[in-house]
Swiss-Prot record:
GO terms for molecular function: GTP binding; metal ion binding. PROSITE patterns: G_ENGB (PS51706). SUPFAM superfamilies: P-loop containing nucleoside triphosphate hydrolases. It comes from Flavobacterium psychrophilum (strain ATCC 49511 / DSM 21280 / CIP 103535 / JIP02/86). This is Probable GTP-binding protein EngB. GTP binds at residues 30-37, 57-61, 75-78, 142-145, 177-179. Necessary for normal cell division and for the maintenance of normal septation. The keyword Cell cycle applies. Its cofactor is Mg(2+). Belongs to the TRAFAC class TrmE-Era-EngA-EngB-Septin-like GTPase superfamily. EngB GTPase family.
Length: 205
């Protein structure tokens, strides 16, 4: 799939105020500084569609971007950010869970994980949460250019082992990406396109 247009539509923290159009939505979420904004900019061929920042927790709202006029890319706040107040964190967590549990247009969540690190408890807990609410999701490993291919394979295998220990029957669908080298761009966009085509056929688009 080629992305021809990417347009910012709205930022908000209330699910009922999200766009009313019945277009498929793909949510991107991960721990702070996982490289989410860089990945989104790489996928959409924009240098600053999503704002990049070295400060954790910079994204603090639900951000909708309309792609090719027929689907939405949704940029969500990171989880596990340390430099916001406890009350603020609770509010973020509430509207994130509201979005995941109430948003009918959401068809898939992409959970971003920094491939450089070992399996993190907070990532495993979030993946378990998505499984519990039966929301389709994929894992997107980021920053693959920062370590060797051998290390990448080792860390993916470690996540597989950790998930199997947490009662997953198999490793969820996953992608290995690098925003710097555009690694994984085509496979991720192809996946979104395949899901979109199925949805469009079902709805007679």
């Amino acid at each position: 799939m080629k992305i021809n247009t990417a347009e910012f539509i709205i930022s908000n923290s209330i699910v009922s105020l999200c766009p009313q159009e019945h277009l498929p939505e793909y949510a991107f979420i991960g721990r702070s500084n996982v490289g989410k904004s860089s990945l989104i900019n790489m996928l959409t061929n924009h240098k600053s569609l999503a704002k990049t920042s070295g400060r954790p927790g910079k994204t603090q709202l639900i951000n909708h971007f309309k792609i090719n006029n027929n689907w939405f890319l949704v940029d969500l706040p990171g989880y596990g950010y340390a430099k916001v107040s406890k009350k603020t964190k609770e509010v973020f967590q509430q509207f994130i869970t509201d979005y995941f549990e109430k948003r009918e247009q959401l068809v898939c969540a992409f959970v971003l994980i920094d491939i450089r690190h070992e399996a993190q408890k907070i990532d495993l807990e979030f993946i378990t949460y998505l499984g519990e609410i039966e929301l389709p999701f994929c894992i997107v490993f980021t920053k693959a250019d920062k370590i060797s291919k051998g290390k990448v394979a080792q860390h993916v295998a470690a996540y597989r082992t950790a998930l199997l220990k947490n009662n997953w029957e198999e490793m969820p669908h996953h992608f290995v990406t690098s925003a710097t080298e555009h690694t994984g761009k085509e496979s991720l966009l192809s996946y979104i396109d395949e899901v979109n085509q199925d949805i469009f056929k079902q709805n007679g688009f």
